[in-house]
Amino acid sequence: MSLKRCRALPVVAIVALVASGVITFIWSQQRRLIYFPSAGPVPSASSVLPAGRDVVVETQDGMRLGGWYFPHTSGGSGPAVLVCNGNAGDRSMRAELAVALHGLGLSVLLFDYRGYGGNPGRPSEQGLAADARAAQEWLSGQSDVDPARIAYFGESLGAAVAVGLAVQRPPAALVLRSPFTSLAEVGAVHYPWLPLRRLLLDHYPSIERIASVHAPVLVIAGGSDDIVPATLSERLVAAAAEPKRYVVVPGVGHNDPELLDGRVMLDAIRRFLTETAVLGQ
């Protein structure tokens, strides 16, 4: 063995040890890198809309989750929407969305997952799925809601939660804002050097589930989204069954207000829901 090769071996070993240490750290801390909850406190629902109510959704595993409920005002049982938030903040960051959806004539349930908005527990794929099921059950049980006219709205990671829920409990319509194909694929956009498929504890495989959703689907993407590129949203809608719609909001990024309560997005949602049992006559 040459002297040069002898000197190279320790360098290779050091690089391997460092890489192994980085991967081990990321594996052990991955949920802290995926979920960014706000601890609260969250303001009252009535500070958003006068008729808003602070509610508690209880999961099968005993979690008591805070939420906001904004009932429609048309009388009788009517259409509603269940909102599944993205991976950051809490429901107060979606107040404008709740107001906008309520303005379409919908009752709106906006809830926080476990670990978010002062709720107990820690977020995980399995936990968020349980939270969404509990929220859907709560909303379906309201006297002013027609269970056959409930839509799901999912934002980013919440879109993956909504897809999983829709497979188990089909809605009247499914609206996905900035959805990705899988957590591994969106992660690879930001960390292409990591073997994410092997590392991830949570997967959110929407691309494998979307074809099993038996409901009309609307996908909305930001044309300049550098967190969840529109190409991933486009691939997801391509895998969905008909009827489906795909809308790109040009020049808009992942967290821009145009994807919270912007006119293009809301017009697309209104037109879409009017074509379904949610708002259709």
From Swiss-Prot:
Signal peptide residue numbers: none
Keyword flag Transcription: no
Family: To S.pombe bem46 and yeast YNL320w.
Main location: membrane
Official protein name in the record: Uncharacterized protein MT2364
Keywords noted in UniProt: Cell membrane, Membrane, Transmembrane, Transmembrane helix
One GO CC term on file: plasma membrane
TM regions (residue ranges): 8-28, 97-117, 147-167, 210-230
InterPro entries: AB_hydrolase_fold, Hydrolase_4
Subcellular location: Cell membrane
Membrane topology: Multi-pass membrane protein
Pfam families assigned to the protein according to its UniProt record, in alphabetical order: Hydrolase_4
Organism this protein belongs to: Mycobacterium tuberculosis (strain CDC 1551 / Oshkosh)
